[in-house]
């Protein structure tokens, strides 16, 4: 039964699953920071002419009453895919990469990754040039992780916690890797503007969610700042980014159990059977901050992402005008009493509001997984030990409520993030 001039609105809160990834090149452990993945703004190309080969992997055992990750995030406009249940032993993520600086002005990096039983894929294929060896400007092109900042970009990559943050799953369907070009500026300012660490500006193909195969190139900007607080109150770092996408015919499966985890939206050019489609504009805004407090070994981190969408949302059951907002983030506290031990907790949340106006609005909302709505949230705690700087052994426990179902999780994880396996200079 069709509805005319129907309206629908709803709200939601947090969840998700896991997908661990390794950087598009050199992945390293910082003694008081998480394992670090590189994006287009910070490619792991040697500073001087030479070659590096890198590898990293994370394996784990997860025990839970319900599937991990949760089959779906209700009330979130996504791709409708259902991730593979990863309870038991699994390869969370593994990568193998190489980077080379051919001359002081030209370098390149390539990285291949694999998640569990999924096929291997190219995570990075990046060419980078600079006008001089000591230039503040770098121009890169190819495939790479989007420049979101290390807090948001690295979450879910050899992270201390074993699940992809809820907002990353909702906003990007996990990792956001695109083809494009990026101009980086890394100034060395003094005085009143010494806090400004860098600016990135790029154009990206936007073929992966939340973009689509037929989307226009997406402009993306990111700024990074850092400094010391007054009165010896510790050091801080902060990042913010913005991107505008214009997907056309971005399909999503009417939620089903056999769609598998995907990053590229199904096409809307043929039949609308078991598909919902979106044409419109997507605005993505994110920010993150990290504070190394005066307390020894204590670091506090916060991150948030907002996704606004407006346009046409339709299926075989109706055609509507759509406006939606998805927002979420997390707060994290880390205590490292020594360089060998990590104790951390993370609280996540996710919220959504949606408005559909037009024939069949309620049916379209149901097809698009916007109904029924249940709030979601997650709390996680971990204890980690580093017998070697490149190895993290961690025990994790958490509780989440997603799609109206509670789930308790206990995990044992091994994360290996070495420095270069092979390094040559010339």
Report residues per predicted region:
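Bacterial N-terminal signal peptides
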Residues: 21-31
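Detector for outer-membrane/organellar transmembrane beta-barrel domains
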Residues: 46-48, 52, 69-73, 228-369
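Gram-negative outer-membrane beta-barrel proteins
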Residues: 61-67, 116-120, 147-151, 189-191, ...
């Amino acid at each position: 039964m069709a509805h005319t001039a129907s309206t629908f609105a709803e709200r939601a809160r947090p969840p998700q699953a896991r997908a661990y990834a390794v950087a598009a090149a050199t992945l390293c452990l910082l003694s008081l920071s998480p394992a670090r993945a590189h994006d287009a703004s910070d490619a792991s190309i040697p500073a001087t002419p030479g070659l590096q080969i890198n590898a990293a992997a994370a394996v784990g055992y997860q025990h839970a009453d319900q599937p991990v990750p949760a089959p779906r995030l209700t009330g979130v406009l996504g791709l409708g895919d259902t991730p593979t249940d990863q309870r038991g032993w699994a390869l969370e993520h593994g990568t193998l990469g190489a980077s080379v600086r051919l001359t002081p002005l030209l370098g390149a990096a390539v990285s291949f990754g694999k998640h569990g039983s999924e096929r291997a894929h190219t995570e990075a294929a990046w060419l980078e040039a600079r006008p001089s060896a000591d230039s503040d400007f770098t121009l890169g092109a190819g495939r790479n992780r989007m420049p979101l900042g290390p807090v948001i970009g690295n979450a879910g990559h050899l992270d201390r916690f074993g699940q992809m943050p809820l907002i990353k799953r909702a906003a990007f369907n996990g990792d956001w890797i695109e083809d494009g070009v990026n101009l980086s500026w890394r100034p060395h300012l003094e005085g009143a503007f010494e806090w400004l660490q860098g600016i990135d500006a790029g154009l990206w193909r936007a073929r992966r969610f939340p973009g689509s195969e037929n989307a226009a190139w997406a402009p993306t900007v990111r700024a990074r700042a850092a400094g010391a607080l007054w009165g010896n109150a510790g050091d801080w770092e902060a990042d913010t980014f913005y991107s505008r996408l214009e997907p056309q015919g971005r399909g999503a499966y009417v939620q089903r159990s056999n769609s598998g985890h995907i990053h590229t939206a199904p096409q809307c050019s043929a039949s609308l059977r078991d598909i919902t489609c979106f044409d419109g504009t997507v605005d993505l805004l994110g920010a993150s901050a990290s504070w190394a407090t005066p307390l020894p070994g204590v670091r506090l981190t916060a991150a948030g992402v907002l996704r606004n969408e407006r346009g046409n949302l339709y299926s075989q059951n109706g055609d509507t005008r759509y406006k939606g907002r998805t927002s979420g983030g997390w707060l994290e506290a880390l205590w490292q009493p020594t360089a060998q031990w990590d104790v951390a907790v993370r609280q996540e949340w996710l919220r959504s509001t949606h408005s559909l106006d037009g024939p069949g609005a309620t049916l379209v909302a149901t097809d698009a997984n916007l109904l029924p709505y249940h709030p979601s949230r997650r709390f996680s705690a971990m204890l980690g030990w580093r017998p070697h700087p490149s190895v993290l052994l961690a025990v994790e426990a958490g509780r989440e409520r997603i799609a109206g179902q509670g789930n308790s999780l206990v995990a044992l994880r091994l994360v290996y993030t070495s420095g270069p396996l092979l390094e040559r200079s010339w």
